[in-house]
């Protein structure tokens, strides 16, 4: 029995020991699992604080937070489009990490990291990290750093509904592809478009003046505005920049309020000026100039990118002659892909205008080319585009800055161009300076003014600066000048400065411009068939060239029905000529070689005879199409009257 008891005791001890071992294992596993679950719950609570309801860490980060980003709206009162981590991350204050891109699908679950972030926020402000790249990370299959070296960013054709909405919202609000912009670094690299001639530092003076850079904006997209400013800071010698003055023309988007101030608080050269009401570009620029202190003012639009070496060539010209106004070559940044397009100095154009007082680009005239040994040398330009230029501050003041009676924008570039040349200055385009600009096909901004702003500004311009040549603009608007306000102070300015005449300007600065007064006829071209109420009608401009010219009921208001018959037999709409090559009658750039653009008006039969084809211009029975027919003097559909026809000018 003792033996049996001893065996049972040993077995019991073993069973108890085994049971204790199992209990300890179970207790350890339960404790570990509970710890993990509690940590995960705490982490989820921390990370969920910055997430939009119902948004998880979706692939590509294309949920609501991106839609917020593309709408330029913050997730909270003081948090802008950089205030959320896309895909469900913790909030970060915009002024701490405003240019650090949200990371798709990465959760900040560590509470210690959150405490460290809050502690860091209490420390003195530091400059935002310079390796920041973009606001949103690219979708799958995108290169890591899209848009570098100015390369295009092309979105996939197949997009999720969320992504498509975000893209569409960006286009609607900005008239360019904001979604693509938000994929690209605000410090992206660009190609160097300069000729070798430009890179010789010995060409530029060493004691160049400082400039204040004035950038006016209204509801500009976050990344585009930041990229503009950083391109100035990153590619300009620090000692040549006085201040970068950001003039807010009464923006109402939240990301342009405290978020913008917090971001640029780390950059002492950047100053933000707020307009107290919507002023428009012209008066916003005047406001910026009033806050400038440096000897040179440089104006840039808020959707630009400066390239390497852009500034020194501009300042050099002003340092040599303070009455020289200089413009960089304006390269095109695609509104869709943000690709940076540029051309070498041989392809540089100069500014002009037409008698609608609209700015236009033209090749450098042969007379100007002969003045230079290199195509990279600065060239005279009759006018400037107006958005990007540098000017001596005292000379700008002497010229009366901008006409404060101009509203919003339009015409200010021609006014400054005319008075620069007529009042003792020169206007140049500098091929060694390149700045990219996003050209939009429409304006995303709305004004409540019932006034035709462009016409009002243009009439003020014509009344002050164009002398007797103003009549050619008035013909284009049917002599309906409207209310242009009081220009007596601007006329006094011109008299006080003893400026030259507009005829001097045309003869010496822009002799290439066709003068309507030299034409044989100018005004409407009316067909006498089918009631005699149909006129030749076509919009001008390069984008309308090579399209069939149409007809429209005569309205006697100029515009698309204002034509000129030159002594050379051209039927002109400014720089476009009526052209017939055997198919449709179209507008084509005037080439001066007669041929397809040579027309003769037969006054006795009232026919327009085409030189190379031998046919006559007619209209269809439906009165909506031009025809070319075998000439027959008896057909009224081939008969035309030309307004202000004067055969003595032939």
From Swiss-Prot:
- Pathway(s) this gene product operates in, as recorded in its UniProt entry: Protein modification; protein glycosylation
**Subunit comment:** Isoform A forms homotetramer. Isoform B forms homodimer.
State the Gene3D superfamilies in the record. 2.80.10.50, Spore Coat Polysaccharide Biosynthesis Protein SpsA, Chain A
Q: What residue spans carry the region label Disordered?
A: 84-154
Q: What is this protein called?
A: Putative polypeptide N-acetylgalactosaminyltransferase 9
Please list the reactions this protein catalyses.
L-seryl-[protein] + UDP-N-acetyl-alpha-D-galactosamine = a 3-O-[N-acetyl-alpha-D-galactosaminyl]-L-seryl-[protein] + UDP + H(+); L-threonyl-[protein] + UDP-N-acetyl-alpha-D-galactosamine = a 3-O-[N-acetyl-alpha-D-galactosaminyl]-L-threonyl-[protein] + UDP + H(+)
Q: Which residues bind substrate?
A: 216, 249, 278, 302-303, 440, 445
The record places the following residue ranges in the Cytoplasmic compartment, namely 1-11
Q: State the EC number(s).
A: 2.4.1.41
Region (Catalytic subdomain B), start-end ranges? 378-440
Chain positions recorded as Mn(2+) binding sites: 301, 303, 437
According to its UniProt entry, this protein's organism is Drosophila melanogaster (Fruit fly)
CDD domains, sorted: beta-trefoil_Ricin_Pgant9-like, pp-GalNAc-T
Free-text comment about domains = There are two conserved domains in the glycosyltransferase region: the N-terminal domain (domain A, also called GT1 motif), which is involved in manganese coordination and substrate binding and the C-terminal domain (domain B, also called Gal/GalNAc-T motif), which is involved in catalytic reaction and UDP-Gal binding.
What family classification does the UniProt entry report for this protein? Belongs to the glycosyltransferase 2 family. GalNAc-T subfamily.
Fetch the InterPro entries from UniProt. GalNAc-T, Glyco_trans_2-like, Nucleotide-diphossugar_trans, Ricin_B-like_lectins, Ricin_B_lectin
Q: Name one GO cellular component term.
A: Golgi membrane
The UniProt keywords, alphabetically, are: Disulfide bond, Glycoprotein, Glycosyltransferase, Golgi apparatus, Lectin, Manganese, Membrane, Metal-binding, Signal-anchor, Transferase, Transmembrane, Transmembrane helix
The region annotated as signal peptide is none
Name its co-factor(s): Mn(2+)
**Top-level taxon of origin:** Eukaryota
Q: Which GO terms describe its molecular function?
A: carbohydrate binding; metal ion binding; polypeptide N-acetylgalactosaminyltransferase activity
Gene null: resulting phenotype: RNAi-mediated knockdown in the whole body, in the mesoderm, the respiratory system or the amnioserosa results in lethality. RNAi-mediated knockdown in the epidermis or the digestive system and reproductive tract results in a reduction in viability. RNAi-mediated knockdown in salivary glands results in aberrant secretory granule morphology showing angular, shard-like morphology.
Please name the GO terms of the biological process aspect recorded for this protein, alphabetically. Answer: protein O-linked glycosylation; sexual reproduction
Side Lumenal, residues: 32-650
């Amino acid at each position: 029995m003792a033996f049996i008891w001893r065996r049972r005791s040993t077995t019991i001890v073993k069973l108890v020991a085994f049971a204790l071992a199992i209990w300890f294992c179970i207790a350890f596993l339960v404790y570990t699992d509970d710890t993990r679950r509690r940590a995960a719950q705490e982490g989820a609570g921390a990370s969920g604080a910055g997430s939009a309801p119902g948004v998880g860490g979706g692939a590509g980060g294309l949920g609501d937070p991106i839609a917020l980003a593309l709408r330029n709206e913050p997730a909270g009162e003081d948090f802008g489009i950089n205030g959320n981590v896309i895909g469900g991350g913790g909030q970060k204050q915009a002024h701490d990490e405003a240019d650090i891109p949200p990371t798709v699908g990465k959760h900040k679950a560590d509470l210690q990291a959150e405490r460290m972030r809050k502690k860091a926020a209490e420390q003195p402000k530091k400059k935002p990290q310079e390796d920041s790249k973009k606001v949103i990370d690219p979708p799958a299959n995108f290169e890591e750093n899209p848009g570098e070296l100015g390369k295009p960013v092309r979105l996939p054709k197949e997009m999720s509904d969320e992504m498509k909405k975000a893209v569409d919202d960006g286009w609607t609000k900005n008239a360019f592809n904001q979604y693509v912009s938000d994929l690209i670094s605000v410090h992206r690299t660009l190609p160097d478009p300069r000729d070798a001639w430009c890179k010789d530092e010995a060409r530029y003076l060493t004691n160049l003046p400082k400039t204040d850079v004035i950038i006016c904006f209204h509801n500009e997209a976050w990344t585009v505005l930041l990229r503009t400013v950083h391109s100035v800071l990153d590619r300009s010698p620090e000692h040549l920049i006085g201040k970068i003055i950001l003039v807010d023309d009464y923006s109402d988007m939240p990301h342009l309020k405290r978020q913008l101030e917090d971001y640029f608080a780390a950059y002492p050269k950047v100053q933000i000026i707020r307009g107290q009401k919507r002023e428009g570009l012209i008066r916003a620029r005047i406001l910026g100039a009033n806050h400038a202190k440096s000897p040179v003012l440089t104006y840039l639009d808020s959707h630009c990118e400066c390239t390497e070496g852009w500034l020194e060539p501009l300042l050099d010209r002003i340092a040599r002659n303070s009455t020289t106004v200089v413009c960089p070559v304006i390269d095109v940044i695609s509104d869709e892909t943000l690709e940076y397009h540029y051309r070498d100095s041989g392809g540089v154009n100069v500014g002009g205008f037409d008698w609608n007082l609209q700015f236009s680009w033209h090749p450098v005239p042969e007379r100007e080319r002969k003045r230079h040994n290199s195509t990279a040398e600065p060239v005279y330009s009759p006018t400037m585009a107006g958005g990007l230029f540098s000017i001596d501050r005292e000379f700008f003041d002497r010229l009366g800055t901008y006409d404060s009676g101009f509203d919003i924008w339009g015409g200010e570039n021609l006014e400054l161009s005319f008075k620069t040349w007529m009042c003792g200055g020169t206007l140049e385009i500098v091929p060694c300076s390149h700045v990219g600009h996003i050209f939009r096909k429409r304006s995303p901004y709305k004004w409540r003014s019932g006034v035709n702003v462009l016409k009002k500004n243009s009439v003020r311009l014509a009344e002050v600066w164009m002398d007797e040549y103003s009549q050619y603009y008035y013909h284009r608007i049917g002599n309906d000048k409207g209310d242009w306000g009081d220009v007596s102070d601007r006329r006094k300015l011109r008299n006080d400065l003893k400026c030259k005449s507009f005829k001097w300007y045309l003869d010496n600065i822009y002799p290439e411009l066709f003068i309507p007064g030299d034409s044989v006829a100018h005004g409407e071209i009316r067909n006498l068939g089918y009631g005699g109420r149909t006129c030749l009608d076509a919009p001008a401009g390069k984008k309308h060239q090579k399209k069939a010219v149409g007809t429209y009921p005569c309205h006697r208001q100029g515009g698309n029905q204002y034509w000129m018959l030159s002594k050379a037999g051209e039927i002109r709409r400014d720089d476009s000529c009526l052209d017939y090559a055997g198919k449709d009658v179209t507008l084509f750039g005037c080439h001066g070689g007669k041929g397809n653009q040579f027309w003769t008006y037969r006054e006795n039969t009232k026919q327009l005879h085409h030189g190379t084809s031998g046919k006559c211009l007619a209209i269809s029975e439906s009165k909506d199409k031009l025809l070319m027919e075998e000439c027959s003097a008896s057909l009224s559909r081939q008969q035309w009257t030309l307004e202000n026809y004067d055969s003595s000018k032939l």
